[in-house]
Structures are given as structure tokens and as C-alpha cells.
Amino acid sequence: MKRSATLSLITVISAAYLVNLVYPAFYDYTALFRPFVDSGEYWRLFTVALVHGGLTHLFFNMFSLFVLGNPVEAALGKARFLVIFFISLLTGSLASIYLTNDLHVSVGASGAVFGFY
């Protein structure tokens, strides 16, 4: 049986949350902070989805991804689903850094999940 991309993303993001609990410095290298992106740390536009503000934040992001992601993946296929996820994540990250003040730190996968609405 093939594993769905939705469940794979949920597994990876949830595992990253556990890594962050054990290694808090993980947050320092993955959270979205405009001054770091401006200095060339472009990976943060994507790694922001790996860190969350707490267990409740993680739960609601992953629950929403599960509820919305499964039907989208079933309808469009794994590849298109992943394209939507990562384009939405990038778009959400760019909106976050350009619509908030320079000292705002963003975390979570909400931008990617909102792309499925």
C-alpha cells in the first residue's frame, strides 16, 4: 500500500516538533524571521512549517492538513497535491515577512494548509 503524501507531511512535521522539544536550537535555524531571510537564509521560507508555537498549534495545523489534504490529494494526485502545498507554503511565508514588521517571527504550516481552501 502506498503512503499518502498527506500522511507523510504530517509525520515529518510532527517529528520535527519532537526534534524541537529535544533540541530547542532547531527553532533558531527554521523559524521565519525576515532579517535572516534578507541575509540569504532562504530555506526559512519552507522550514517555517517544521516548527510550531506549541502542541495545540501543531494539532490544529495537522488536523486541518489531514481533513483538507486527503480529499485534495485523492482528487489531484500526489504530485499536484505537493505542488499546491509547497507553493502555498512559499506564498504564506512571503506574505508573512512582507505584511508584518521586520521583528516578527513566524512559525507553523498554516500558510500551506490555507492553500487547500
Write out the residue ranges for each language-model feature:
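Alpha-helical transmembrane segments and their membrane-interface exit regions
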Residues: 114-117
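N-terminal TM1-TM2 helical hairpin plus the immediately adjacent luminal interfacial "cap"
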Residues: 2-109
